[in-house]
From Swiss-Prot:
GO terms for molecular function: manganese ion binding; metalloaminopeptidase activity. It comes from Yersinia enterocolitica serotype O:8 / biotype 1B (strain NCTC 13174 / 8081). Belongs to the peptidase M17 family. The active site is at residues 282, 356. GO terms for cellular component: cytoplasm. The gene is pepA. The lineage of its organism: Bacteria, Pseudomonadati, Pseudomonadota, Gammaproteobacteria, Enterobacterales. Keywords: Aminopeptidase, Cytoplasm, Hydrolase, Manganese, Metal-binding, Protease. Binds 2 manganese ions per subunit. This is Probable cytosol aminopeptidase. It catalyses: Release of an N-terminal amino acid, Xaa-|-Yaa-, in which Xaa is preferably Leu, but may be other amino acids including Pro although not Arg or Lys, and Yaa may be Pro. Amino acid amides and methyl esters are also readily hydrolyzed, but rates on arylamides are exceedingly low; Release of an N-terminal amino acid, preferentially leucine, but not glutamic or aspartic acids.
Length: 503
């Protein structure tokens, strides 16, 4: 799908369709008022007859409006004008894209980017429109034998901006939006792949292909079980013992900073390509969704693609910690004591708390890069879902400025995160009679005790942990990976690169 920006009057557009907003109750947006005036009150007369109230998501498609060059006008309900916020704006764009796609409008000029969204500029509105459009049109049908496509799918969308001065900002927003959307799609595609295809070797192959596609800036190395053993990554290795698929850790290194000595930003993604729970096996219901336990690694892969496509002037390292947790004759057991790469020992009380056992060694491994910051991303705890639902990602950190940066980026990107504490009391829940710590700390505060566990392996650098167990995928009728938090981390890196889109 092609995107562009322009600045022009609605009555001069010869597009197949013009998209304008209507507020509740039956109030025309400024652009809709212009069209109404040119059409001698045609649109307002329809509204007076009750054809459209203006509630969020309502639509009315008009054909051959008097004195208008465009074939059609799509009126889209935007709710109450003063209440139009980020969430409603995205809903309006989503409804617009679906309507255009379903009604055979192959091209359109969209004036919704001229609406006033509280606290948001033109760059944000155009970029969010691009990302939302790509998200709305996303399908995962690679493994279907019969694929259905719209008869006349939407091919081209032009976003109108109020003044010519904002064209440059709009063009930059499209560039950034397309890159972020590409990263989100890559993460979703990986997440939606079935576990009989997407194992640690598949993750490694994708990481290598990324290096091939962006060979100027990216080098990928894959660390297998033999090298992990030599490195002392016994905790990581233990989790994969029950599986016939080899555990593989893929390290994607991007160099974009002109200063070769600049410290890298390191992203570490949990890549459990299937999590049965191991000996502490999960219930059968919903176990199919445990293919999504690698969405942390999928996020890192998606973000590395964004970084490479935008050629950000940063050094970024992405680690995909690939593994599979299965029961078997060689599987690790409750009661085992593991020696981690850091030398600390862990008593295994539950083999279904395996993600932290993989991550702790990966977090120790990345010390060698002398990182600026390290951020791990993991579908780690059901407790985080209980705390924050499926809407907000959990954030923990040992460094206040980093936590504030990530929260700010989450608000900018509309990919929200919320900080949880790492208090001394929670560390006490991890006490073990037989090892330095246990791998679980009981039901109370489970998301926080998991973060406390990881923090014991991050003392040498500034670190943040994103628990995406509630936000990485959807269940039910619309089951599928969400691609979160690719947008959050992409915004964080754009901010670090000084490309935050502020006019």
């Amino acid at each position: 799908m092609e995107f562009s920006v322009k600045s022009g009057s609605p009555e001069k557009q010869r597009s197949a369709c013009i998209v304008v907003g209507v507020f509740e109750p039956r109030r025309l947006s400024p652009i809709a008022e212009q069209l109404d005036k040119i059409s001698d009150g045609y649109i307002s007369a329809l509204l007076r007859r009750g054809e459209l109230e203006g509630k969020v998501g309502q639509t009315l498609l008009l054909h051959h409006v008097p004195n208008i060059l465009s074939e059609r006008i799509l009126l889209i309900g935007c709710g109450k004008e003063r209440e139009l916020d980020e969430r409603q704006y995205k809903q309006v764009i989503q409804k617009t894209i679906n309507t255009l796609n379903d009604t055979g409008s192959m091209e359109a000029v969209c004036f919704l980017t001229e609406l006033h969204v509280k606290g948001r500029n033109t760059y944000w509105k155009v970029r969010q429109a691009v990302e939302t459009a790509k998200e709305t049109l996303y399908t995962f049908d690679q493994l279907k034998s019969n694929k259905t496509e719209p008869r006349r799918p939407l091919r081209k969308m032009v976003f109108n901006v109020p003044t010519r001065r904002e064209l440059t900002s709009g063009e930059r927003a499209i560039q950034h939006g397309l890159a972020v959307a590409s990263g989100i799609k890559a993460a979703k595609d990986l997440g939606n792949m079935p576990p009989n295809i997407c194992n640690a070797a598949y993750l490694a192959s994708q990481a290598r292909q990324l290096a091939d596609a962006f060979s100027t800036n990216i080098i990928t190395r894959v660390i297998g079980e033999q090298q992990m053993k030599e490195l002392g990554m016994h905790s990581y290795l233990a989790v994969g013992h029950g599986s016939q698929n080899e555990s593989l850790m893929s390290v994607i290194e991007y160099k974009g900073n002109p200063n070769p000595d600049a410290k890298p930003i390191v992203l570490v993604g949990k890549g459990l390509t299937f999590d049965s729970g191991g000996i502490s096996i999960k219930p059968a219901e919903g176990m199919d969704e445990m293919k999504y336990d690698m969405c942390g690694a999928a996020t890192v892969y998606g973000v590395m693609r964004v970084v490479a496509e935008l050629q950000l002037p940063l050094n970024v390292i992405g680690v995909l910690a690939g593994c599979e947790n299965m029961p078997g004759g060689r599987a690790y057991r409750p009661g085992d004591i593991l020696t981690t790469m850091s030398g600390q020992t862990v008593e295994v009380l539950n083999t279904d708390a395996e993600g932290r056992l993989v991550l702790c060694d990966a977090l120790t491994y990345v010390e060698r890069f002398e990182p600026e910051v390290v951020i791990d991303i993991a579908t780690l705890t059901g407790a985080c879902v209980v705390a924050l639902g499926h809407h907000i990602t959990g954030l923990m950190s040992n460094h206040n400025p980093l936590a504030h940066e990530l929260i700010g980026a989450s608000e900018q990107a509309g990919d929200r995160a919320w900080r949880l504490p790492l208090g001394d009391e929670f560390y006490e829940q991890l006490d073990s009679n037989f090892a330095d710590m246990a791998n679980i700390g009981g039901r109370a505060g489970g998301a926080i005790t998991a973060g406390c566990f990881l923090s014991r392996f991050t003392r040498k650098y500034s670190w943040a942990h994103l628990d995406i167990a509630g936000t990485a995928w959807r269940s039910g009728k619309n089951k599928g990976a969400t691609g979160r938090p690719v947008a959050l981390l992409s915004q964080f890196l754009l901010n670090r690169a000084g490309l935050n889109g502020d006019d």
